């Protein structure tokens, strides 16, 4: 931000709604809690974050490939189109529950696959879901730094890893 005032527009059905929003925005500006409304999706955020993260932390080619695959196949098909600012902890908990019922290989390179009945029975491991959580936690911490959101929308507790799976 250059320090210059920036303008934006919001529409409301009634004058009362507009006045209430104005009061809220002015209060948030005074508190320092105002976020500029942003339409960035989870998918857009993750594809901005991966190159930064991978360069900053010198990811190996394997880590890079696995992270991109996780985003393409496990995150984007389910919550990728959601706006970062609209995502809540409840949405992430629902997403984890969906992943727990998702067959391995449901998506390959982001494309939904036709699976056999046998393949449909082999579900994602709790380890995979935990890895998704770890990736999202790091990515959303950047979203906080980038002033897209105030807090990370992930559940306080990470999904449990079931040791008996192995």
Identify the meaning behind each predicted range:
Residues 36-144, 153-159:
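Short, Lys/Arg-enriched alpha-helical recognition elements, typified by the DNA-recognition helix
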Residues 159-166:
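Short, intrinsically disordered, charge-balanced linker/junction segments flanking boundaries
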Residues 1-39:
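Short, surface-exposed polybasic/aromatic micro-patch for ligand or macromolecular engagement
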């Amino acid at each position: 931000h250059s320090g210059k005032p920036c303008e934006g527009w919001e529409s409301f059905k009634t004058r009362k709604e507009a006045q209430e929003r104005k009061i809220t925005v002015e209060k948030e500006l005074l508190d320092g809690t105002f976020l500029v409304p942003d339409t960035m999706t989870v998918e857009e955020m993750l594809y901005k974050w991966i190159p930064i993260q991978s360069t900053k932390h010198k990811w190996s080619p394997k880590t890079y490939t696995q992270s991109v695959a996780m985003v393409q196949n496990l995150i984007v098909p389910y919550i990728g189109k959601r706006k970062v600012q609209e995502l809540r902890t409840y949405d992430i908990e629902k997403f984890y529950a969906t992943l727990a019922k998702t067959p391995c290989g449901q998506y390959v390179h982001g494309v939904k696959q036709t699976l056999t009945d046998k393949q449909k029975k082999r579900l994602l491991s709790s380890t995979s879901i935990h890895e998704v959580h770890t990736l999202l936690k790091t990515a959303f911490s950047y979203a906080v730094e980038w002033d897209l959101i105030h807090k990370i929308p992930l559940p306080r507790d990470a999904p449990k890893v079931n040791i008996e799976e192995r």
